[in-house]
């Protein structure tokens, strides 16, 4: 059987100086997405994708490892300045921001964009442990 010609596209290297880091910290996981100013994703990482499973995904250390992974991938695109937007009440909020700072980004602003309902949906029942 003849082998089909497969063209491999060379990855286009973007050169973007400043971006936005979206940190979504839920109770179960932490998702870090680094985008450009228009919202196009440059890199992303999660606690689960960093090798943590189960309840270890929701630890601050898992968020730190995920933020470092997303940060290093974004630095390859040339990002130097970051605006951080944090969403959610999870335990990985602060550690993700500290990790992005430690990777070498200059953080211009940190804002909390957690959605607050104007008495919308009924919240989940209280946990009984």
Swiss-Prot record:
GO biological process: translation
The protein's role, per its UniProt record: Located on the platform of the 30S subunit, it bridges several disparate RNA helices of the 16S rRNA. Forms part of the Shine-Dalgarno cleft in the 70S ribosome.
Subunit organization: Part of the 30S ribosomal subunit. Interacts with proteins S7 and S18. Binds to IF-3.
Gene: rpsK
Domain of life: Bacteria
GO MF terms held by the record: rRNA binding; structural constituent of ribosome
Keyword set includes RNA-binding: yes
Keywords, sorted A to Z: Ribonucleoprotein, Ribosomal protein, RNA-binding, rRNA-binding
UniProt GO cellular component terms: ribonucleoprotein complex; ribosome
Name of the protein: Small ribosomal subunit protein uS11
Pfam families the record matches: Ribosomal_S11 (PF00411)
Family, per entry: Belongs to the universal ribosomal protein uS11 family.
PROSITE patterns, per database record: RIBOSOMAL_S11
């Amino acid at each position: 059987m003849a082998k089909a010609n497969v063209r491999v596209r060379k990855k286009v290297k973007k050169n973007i100086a400043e971006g936005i880091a979206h940190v979504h910290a839920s109770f179960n996981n932490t998702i870090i997405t680094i985008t450009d100013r228009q919202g196009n994703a440059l890199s992303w990482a999660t606690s689960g994708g960093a090798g943590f499973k189960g309840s270890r995904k929701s630890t601050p250390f898992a968020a730190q490892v995920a933020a470092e992974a997303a940060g290093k991938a974004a630095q390859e695109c040339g990002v130097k300045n970051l605006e951080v937007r944090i969403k959610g009440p999870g335990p990985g909020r602060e550690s993700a921001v500290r990790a992005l700072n430690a990777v070498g980004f200059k953080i211009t602003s940190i804002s909390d964009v957690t959605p607050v309902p104007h008495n919308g949906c009924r919240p989940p029942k209280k946990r009984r442990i």
